Amino acid sequence: MGDPSKQDILTIFKRLRSVPTNKVCFDCGAKNPSWASITYGVFLCIDCSGSHRSLGVHLSFIRSTELDSNWSWFQLRCMQVGGNANASSFFHQHGCSTSDTNAKYNSRAAQLYREKIKSLASQATRKHGTDLWLDSCVVPPLSPPPKEEDFFASHVSPEVSDTAWASAIAEPSSLTSRPVETTLENNEGGQEQGPSVEGLNVPSKAALEVSSIIKKKPNQAKKGLGAKKGSLGAQKLANTCFNEIEKQAQAADKMKEQEDLAKAAPKEESIVSSLRLAYKDLEIQMKKDEKLNISGKKNVDSDRLGMGFGNCRSGISHSVTSDMQTIEQESPIMAKPRKKYNDDSDDSYFTSSSRYFDEAVELRSSSFSSWDDSSDSYWKKETSKDTETILKTTGYSDRPTARRKPDYEPVENTDEAQKKFGNVKAISSDMYFGRQAQADYETRARLERLSASSSISSADLFEEQRKQAAGNYSLSNVLPSAPNMAQFKQGVRSVAGKLSVFANGVVTSIQDRYGS
């Protein structure tokens, strides 16, 4: 037995899906299911087919009715002997009404139905072979054929329908008698009566319309035709004059317009009164400005300074603008920053004094190295230095206004430093600028003096005096020697000179600041 062709598969499923119960999903009731469970012979939607796949093929085998084309005859027979109607009735008979997929298809009823579908499909395959149709595949055996429901028939009871037909039969006579009465009433009313109803005199047309209404919508016969005999649901026209009604409507419109105008008039009057008050305020303000003779520029200045009349809340105002004068600013002369100048000068005094003390320390240190020099030349040098410092600092007018910065001589861009320090790994600024010559000379002198000794200490190398033992004092150690006394005198003299120079500068600055 060969496999069915694609055309056979489409033909079989087209006929199976034409059954009303197979047009919805077996599990959720969604319309137009396109998947099928071969194990139970039911049609499923795509969402429920995913749930069946998670159960496993031993419980439910899923295939597509539109995409899959490799169906076998046994699988087609399972779908033909099954169906949604057969499966739902079988599960209902065995008491399985749960909507949970796992509980439903793992139940005893699902197991029995699987075995039943398998046995019926095997019998149909042996009996019919490759025939497309089975004897019982068109009408499901376990469910009666569905009857199409009529919407109007379900809403209309038999008694009501009989009444509607009886009223429809008796209707033409009432239609013929009704227009005659209306025409008589119209003739008695005169010419100014309502619209004519002469069109209702034709009985044949009215009878046709009534019959068509009854055929299409029998439920409406209950409302219009069965409730009242001899009426179509239209109201009877009264003997009224349409001209009078029109006049009344026009009069009502005129009254409404007059009421609207009466309501709008107070609003317009309030707006006009507010505008008049605003203009009066402006006129009063302009008169005040004219009285005070305020020009445009003064008025702007007074408003800018916060002295305008518009900012005055009370009626009393100060006459500031009457004596207002415009002062033209001339080019200002830059004043000398006296305070800054004096502060800088004071700073220069303090910095100069520190410089003097630094020079004294340098002189003190140099006196040790040049002890062998004559005292006369030493005193001459010191006196010349003191006079130079006095001449430098006594001139107050020649002092700079700003703090003096040290003058650095620019280093010439030559190749001497590169030739001198080319092979050296590290150099200092003193070595680069040549400020280490004196220190190197003193160091070489100490090394030559200690070259004959067998051992030296750091105190001998740096000429540090050793601490003498306690109790080993002599008169020579207590009294200062002649060189120390001379050095002391020279230091006292230099300090006294510096103090006199500093005092002279302070007195001069006080006189310049407070005397003049």
From Swiss-Prot:
GAP activity stimulated by phosphatidylinositol 4,5-bisphosphate (PIP2). The keyword Membrane applies. Signal peptide: none annotated. InterPro entries: ARFGAP/RecO, ArfGAP_dom, ArfGAP_dom_sf. Residues 173-194 have a biased composition (Polar residues). This is ADP-ribosylation factor GTPase-activating protein 3. One of its GO terms (biological process) is COPI coating of Golgi vesicle. Residues 243-264 form a coiled coil. It is a peripheral membrane protein. A zinc finger (C4-type) spans 25-48. It comes from the Eukaryota. GO terms for cellular component: Golgi membrane. PROSITE patterns: ARFGAP. It is found in: Cytoplasm; Golgi apparatus membrane. Keywords: Coiled coil, Cytoplasm, ER-Golgi transport, Golgi apparatus, GTPase activation, Membrane, Metal-binding, Phosphoprotein, Protein transport, Transport, Zinc, Zinc-finger. CDD domains: ArfGap_ArfGap3. Its main location: cytoplasm. Residues 170-199, 392-414 are annotated as: Disordered. GTPase-activating protein (GAP) for ADP ribosylation factor 1 (ARF1). Hydrolysis of ARF1-bound GTP may lead to dissociation of coatomer from Golgi-derived membranes to allow fusion with target membranes.
